[in-house]
Amino acid sequence: MNVTAVESNTVVLPDHARPARQNWALYLFVIMIPLQNIYVQYLPDFGGGLNFLNLMFIAAFLMALRCGGGLVRGTGVNGWVMLYLAGGVLALMIGLGNVADSTGHGNALKDKSIAVTFLFLAQMSVTDWTGLKRLFLASLVPLPYMFYVLRDQNAAVSAWHYTDHMRISATFMDLGANEMAAFFVTACLVAFGLLIGARVSWGWRAALATAVTLMAVGVVLSYSRTAYIAILAGLAVILLLSRIRLKLMLPALALLVVLPVLMPPAAMERFESISIEEEVRDESTDSRFVFWEEAIHHFKENPLVGIGFHNFHHAEFSSHEMDVHNFFLRELVEKGVLGGVILLGLIWCITRLLWRGLAIVRPGSWYGGLVLGLAGAWVALLIGNVFGDRFTHYAMIAHFWLYAGLAVRGLQLRYAELGAEPDIEPNPEPNLELRDMERTA
């Protein structure tokens, strides 16, 4: 495969030419966006759209313009994401006349879109490796507090045997346990990829190991069966793509052996209840198949452009007035074939971005660890979306788009280091030709 050059629409000056500007508003936004319990409960809403989410987005965007990073061209990611956002606007307009009450649909699309724009804000705000690392570090800052809230809530409901009362949401007060778990899965896998894939200082290792540990425990205490499957699949992907996979194989097998002993009995009960067989699946799993049948029915009736954004859970389309509980089916039923094609393009370009990144990384580099972890998180996210919607809740998904933006900028910076336009077959194994071309970052 010919790997084309990746460039920015803004020239990045050498480090000695001028100091890189910092997007302090984006740092704060990244830290705060998963902490719904703080800004929803305690920060004022002045009305007229003057709330925390909107004001922070405006501030971060204006400061991003000053940073001079621009958007990276040549990956296809930005273009497909823009199509994805435009498809949402089209679906919103189509759907306004399909339900009796569409109140809140516009705000829902706006909030979801703000999370997606983290992809652009990251690229616009970062012009060098130092800025990239700082922005990632900001995403780790809220994790200890989130774990503290999780532990506090879990202490109030914990029991030996599992009950639905044990499903908590930590800082995601407007969401549920599954969304909380999906955030923890992403954070855990990206941090784990950096921990094993990058040669970093002991300070960084301590921060990454802490993040991995806290988020892994958070996933366990979420009692989300989808998250259990997703994180195991993501870990498997990271191990398979890692250059030290043979060294990690024995510890990984040992962990699988002792994991049932380490996990709380209630979590093991939850894990053992995973099944899609009709005779043994529980009510929660069984209900999803009902929602999916209804979604497929309405998709067949409106195949081209769908029934409209955020419409399926209305009584006009869902007999249970529930969400589809499958992101891919939701895109099809609400946006039709057009939305499905855009989604496939989006999935392909992100997968290709990660594959290209793995092909040219310097062994042991910080960027290599980021792409490695994000590859596992991407697979986990796709799996999680089969049994729910892990892609549209802004508080949960914003950090994923941030990491994707950092991966896009990192790819451009890596090509700038190489000073060439190599013809590379994507291969996670060390590339000797590239290693000879490298210089110390």
Predicted regions mapped to residue ranges:
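Loop-to-helix entry and N-terminal half of a specific, functionally important transmembrane alpha helix
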Residues: 22-32, 85, 211, 355-388, ...
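Membrane-interfacial segments
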Residues: 98, 126-130, 156-157, 161, ...
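A membrane-periplasm/extracellular boundary helix in multi-pass inner-membrane enzymes
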Residues: 151-154, 217, 239-279, 283, ...
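Membrane-interface helix termini and inter-helical loops of multi-pass transporters
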Residues: 41-42, 99-103, 157-170
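Alpha-helical transmembrane segments of multi-pass inner-membrane proteins
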Residues: 61, 86-93, 113-118, 131-166, ...
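Membrane-interface micro-motifs in multi-pass membrane enzymes
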Residues: 46-53, 107-112, 172-187, 226, ...
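Transmembrane signal-anchor hairpin modules in multi-pass inner-membrane enzymes, especially those
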Residues: 1-94, 99-103, 107, 127-133, ...
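Long extracytoplasmic/lumenal interhelical loops at the membrane interface
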Residues: 160-163, 168-173, 266, 275-293, ...
